[in-house]
Amino acid sequence: PGPGSAWTPPFHRGAAKGEVREVLKALHETGRLTRQEAVSMLPVIALGAETGDIVLDMCASPGSKTTQIAECLGDSGLVLANEVVSSRVNMLVSNSHRHGSPCIGVVNHDGRHMPMVPESGFDRVLVDAPCTGSGTTRKNPDVWSKWLPSGGRSLHDLQVDLLSRAVTITKPGGRIVYATCSLDPVEDEAVVAEV
């Protein structure tokens, strides 16, 4: 497999032993392997970033989608990885550095007020919005026991504001992908419909 390839190992996370575990660890530490849920790769595939694009990953930490976008860009273009939560920026920087792509820049802004850089707008914007995570039951089985209808409603306005800003800073003819890991239509379809 080459750059940008995806595969699923024949064992569960944490089950690798001995030499296999050491090889996987070394590949991860040198940026040649990034662990990510297969479903989490779909927004970047939908984004369709290409060599030379200027891309904004608006809600980027921990950086798995950022590095996946960088794979699409090769050595030409830019993915600007933004994270509003200061305590998560270090993880984003670390993962971006580990990947080693010259195309990744990291910034710390509130995505609702993201500056338009470049002035002509971004070619592509990924809004992987903060959400309730109600769609992560496969890896987090206790999600439904804690789920409340008010959760999605409490995030809806923020999600609308993030997507609205993405529309403003994307150049004409560009592409925006809005994604959550929620099954709640208040966080998904209702956000897109409102914007």
Model-derived regions: residue spans:
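S-adenosylmethionine
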Residues: 1-195
